[in-house]
């Protein structure tokens, strides 16, 4: 992979909590358009790896570069670095984590207005376009509790895309979906990758990974123990 093609670079990352090592000597390069599936049992380090990339979990050694943001192990990220990271990375949590007191559209607009300082009308226009792209524009004014699992997930994806991140992190996005919805999600991931985004997706579903990811990493006890190609 050419240096200029990388949008994500992880070098020798180690992360521990107390005596427990959660990530050990993790290395990864990712390019625009990559769909990378992270396979592994519960507790293997998949979610921790995503959280470290997003700046949510501090790591002790190594470095992570995402777009123009760079984090060093053992050092607190500066405010400017965190701002660059926020604009480079979108995160879709396993449980969609939508704010229950905000409508679907308001959830999507929140970061655009308060972090990116976009005017409200521009944020709403952008939010509606994202909802339309994801097939849930009719649910823009719905409260999260009124959304189905698949609808809530698509709203969460729209929220993660609202800041136009270069890297999209998705933690177990298939967990609450039936087989047909999983296939729809896989096609959505491929469309997003086709638009030049880099996606990292944690999953227990090896068949999904083989069908929709172009790269597969297997993580066990914090180590990347296998790398293979998917679709």
Kindly give the residue locations of the regions a language model identified.
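Helix-to-loop junction immediately C-terminal to a conserved catalytic motif
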Residues: 54
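ABC ATPase NBD coupling module
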Residues: 71-90, 120
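Helix N-cap at the start of a conserved alpha-helix in ABC-type nucleotide-binding domains
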Residues: 179-181
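A short, proline-enriched helix->beta-strand linker immediately N-terminal to the Walker B motif
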Residues: 162-166
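Catalytic Walker B motif of ABC-type/P-loop ATPase nucleotide-binding domains
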Residues: 168-171
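Conserved ABC ATPase "signature" region
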Residues: 70-72, 120-139
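Conserved ABC ATPase signature
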Residues: 143-147, 151
């Amino acid at each position: 992979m050419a240096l200029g093609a990388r949008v994500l670079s992880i070098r020798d990352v180690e992360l521990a909590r107390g005596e427990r090592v959660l990530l050990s000597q993790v290395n990864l390069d990712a390019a625009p358009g990559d769909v990378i599936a992270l396979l592994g049992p519960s507790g293997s380090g998949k979610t921790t790896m995503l959280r470290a990339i997003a700046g949510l979990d501090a790591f002790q050694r190594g470095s992570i570069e995402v777009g123009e943001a760079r984090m060093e192990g053992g050092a607190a990220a500066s405010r400017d670095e965190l701002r660059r990271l926020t604009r480079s990375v979108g995160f879709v949590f396993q449980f969609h984590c939508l704010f229950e007191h905000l409508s679907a559209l308001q959830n999507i607009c929140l970061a655009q207005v308060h972090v990116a300082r976009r005017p409200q009308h521009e944020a709403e226009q952008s939010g509606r376009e994202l909802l339309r792209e994801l097939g849930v524009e009719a649910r823009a004014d719905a409260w999260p509790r009124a959304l189905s699992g698949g609808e809530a997930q698509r709203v969460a994806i729209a929220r993660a895309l609202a800041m136009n991140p270069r890297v999209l992190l998705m933690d177990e996005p298939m967990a609450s979906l039936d087989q047909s919805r999983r296939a729809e999600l896989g096609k959505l991931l491929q469309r997003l990758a086709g638009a030049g985004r880099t996606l990292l997706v944690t999953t227990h579903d090896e068949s999904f990974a083989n069908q929709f990811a172009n790269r597969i990493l297997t993580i066990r006890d914090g180590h990347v123990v296998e790398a293979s190609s998917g679709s």
